[in-house]
């Protein structure tokens, strides 16, 4: 069984394309590969939001992906004419626009701020609807108590702390969960009306653990709220946490770190994709895998290698 350490990815899959071609030949009748998409921010590499969505669509089609997941903050506009041109370009390129990755934060004692984020999320659902996208990634939000330190940004410090941050003084985690649950519940009617599944990601804040994610999903108990499963965002108890989320997953965001991870904490993580693939087969997952490349290697070489790796690992039985 392969185990993939982020820090060694730069060399672990030399010749991966050839190996994956051989494995493709061995896939038996009665099985099918999961469709593989790619997040547009895999091309951005945290160097700014200037990488155009149009370029990402062109490269994704060139590399042979089945779909593309759009990062909303990377889009230059939310005007309908821009959205429809993006949809048309993806269609002609042979790509599904299979996901929209959004940002919001419901973790605030300020009711007006929570309402602002509820309204924002409803708007994001409508953007997805205009693009024909079936699911959006949503977050709980964070406490916002992490501060820049020693020349490091707030997010760099958060990553050094593996996503853990203190609760706002005078409040409890239970307060935070109530805010998040009440806020997401108000977005469900819009999601149902537009036919867009909300995928709550294990992504810092109250979604740092599988238990936190499932507390929210179970409490709301709606078919329009599922899980966006990120393979790289669990630092501890990885297997148990992945297993807890797997049955509720509507989209997998699959991290790779060729060339080593930008944030050192992720170099400590071993992502065993064949094992994750087996877990998802046990749960009859037939949906999209969306590549999120977060390594230091140039995207032009790392993204195609990542596609080979994911093609090799994710498939399912037809019967």
Model-derived features: where do they sit?
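A short gly/proline-enriched turn/hairpin at secondary-structure junctions
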Residues: 72-75, 201-203, 294
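Metal-dependent catalytic neighborhoods of phosphoester/phosphodiester hydrolases
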Residues: 78-86, 111-116, 299-302
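Conserved beta-strand positions in the central sheet of alpha/beta enzyme cores
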Residues: 69, 99-101, 137, 199, ...
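Short strand->helix junction
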Residues: 75-76, 107, 234, 296
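Glycine-rich, proline-tolerant flexible connector loops at the mouths of alpha/beta enzymes
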Residues: 69-91, 143-148
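Active-site acidic/histidine proton-transfer and metal-coordination neighborhood
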Residues: 5, 10-12, 25-30, 89-92, ...
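Residues that line or immediately flank small-molecule/substrate-binding pockets and catalytic motifs
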Residues: 72, 104, 140, 256, ...
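Histidine-acidic metal/acid-base catalytic patches
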Residues: 1-40, 44-63, 132, 147, ...
């Amino acid at each position: 069984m392969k185990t993939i350490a982020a820090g060694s990815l730069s060399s672990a899959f030399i010749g991966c394309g050839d190996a994956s071609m051989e494995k493709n030949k061995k896939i038996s009748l009665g099985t099918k590969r999961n469709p593989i998409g790619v997040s547009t921010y895999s091309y951005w590499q945290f160097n700014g939001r200037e990488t155009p969505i149009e370029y990402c669509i062109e490269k994704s089609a060139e590399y042979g992906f089945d779909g593309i997941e759009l990062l909303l903050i990377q889009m230059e506009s939310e005007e309908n004419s821009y959205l429809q041109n993006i949809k048309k370009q993806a269609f002609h390129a042979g790509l599904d626009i299979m996901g929209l990755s959004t940002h919001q934060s419901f973790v605030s004692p300020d009711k007006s701020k929570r309402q602002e984020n509820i309204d924002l999320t409803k708007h994001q659902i409508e953007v997805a609807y205009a693009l024909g996208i079936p699911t959006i990634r949503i977050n709980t939000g964070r406490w916002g108590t992490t501060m820049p330190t020693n020349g490091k940004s707030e997010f760099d410090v958060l990553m050094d702390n593996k996503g853990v941050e203190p609760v706002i003084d005078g409040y409890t985690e239970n307060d935070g969960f109530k805010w998040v649950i009440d806020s997401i519940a108000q977005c469900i009617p819009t999601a149902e009306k537009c036919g867009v599944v909300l995928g709550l990601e294990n992504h810092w804040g109250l979604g740092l653990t599988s238990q936190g994610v499932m507390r929210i999903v179970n409490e709301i108990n709606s078919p329009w709220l599922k899980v966006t499963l990120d393979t790289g965002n669990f630092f501890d108890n990885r297997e148990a946490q992945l297993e807890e989320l797997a049955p509720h997953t509507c989209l997998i965001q699959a991290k790779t770190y060729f060339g080593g991870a930008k944030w050192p904490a992720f170099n400590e993580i071993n992502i065993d994709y064949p094992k994750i693939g087996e877990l998802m087969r046990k749960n009859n997952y037939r949906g999209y895998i969306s590549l999120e490349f977060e390594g230091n290697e140039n995207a032009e070489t790392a993204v195609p290698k990542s596609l080979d790796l994911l093609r090799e690992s994710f498939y399912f039985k037809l019967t």
